[in-house]
Amino acid sequence: IIVSLVGSEMCIRDRIKWLLPLLLGYTGGKMVYGHRGGVIGAVTTAAAIVGTETFQFLGAMLVGPGSAWILKKVDGALQDSVPEGFEMLYDNFSLGILGLGTSVVTYLGLAPILTAISDGLGNFASGLVESGLVPLADIPIEVAKVLFLNNAVNHGVLTPLGAAESAEMGKSIYFMLEANPGPGLGLLLAYWFAGSGMWKASAPGSIIIHFFGGIHEVYFPYVLAHPIMIIAMWAGGISADLWFVATDAGLVGPASPGSIFAFLSMTPRGGAVGVLGGVAIGAIASAVVGTLLLRARPIQETDAGVEDEISTSIPGVDV
């Protein structure tokens, strides 16, 4: 049994170190330049993994799309001049040579930079943990989220920190800092209770998509349209994080997408009170503060152009 448990832990660690970054690198490259972009993205990501000791989610998000973009530009410049019948030869050799080049540059040039960034973030996070100031991290996290940088923050920064801590402690609070669905739920409840117009009408549908589907992006327009509501998000996030710290709560792995179901699936045995309590507290705090803000400063719907533009980001809304 002990051998199987150790083997399982090593398997999980290897998947976090190799499989997940490679998938990120391939997916990022494929989004830029199809299958060829995905292949060179994965190859270059492997160089980032080999060149560092830390989990390279951030590196994969950078070098995957970056190397695919380089290949796309090279193909655009050279493919028209390839003689007929030599297309396959060009495809294979160009990808291989460019993949070697981007891998060498990543290994020798970018790997030390990525290591320095990871070490800096790790030291910063350790300082927050030791000083008990982890909840304050929610302030920049929420701002980054509503600017649609949530995936970069979660997978590029928090997931590697959480993976390292989880490998040592069996769970980590870092997996919950960005992915907690509680504050977003509270914000949408506030709009449902105290909002008006399309914001009030669309809130129930957005709640289902956000809380159960884990698509946090659905509530970002609600903050961008009324920026003072970021205070409600801070209230919910900081309150939840204080509870997580007080109860020593954590998840065993990343909850992605940030759905309540993903949270439950990653909750360690005996840790449901800490995890679910933080979700509930975050939702209540965000809902109360958000309702007060909407009562004090109601959202204005006078700019039809802005309203039309934002409504396209909210499911089930026709203006």
Region roles according to the model:
Residues 4, 22-30, 45-48, 64-71, ...:
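Hydrophobic core segments of alpha-helical transmembrane domains in multi-pass membrane transport
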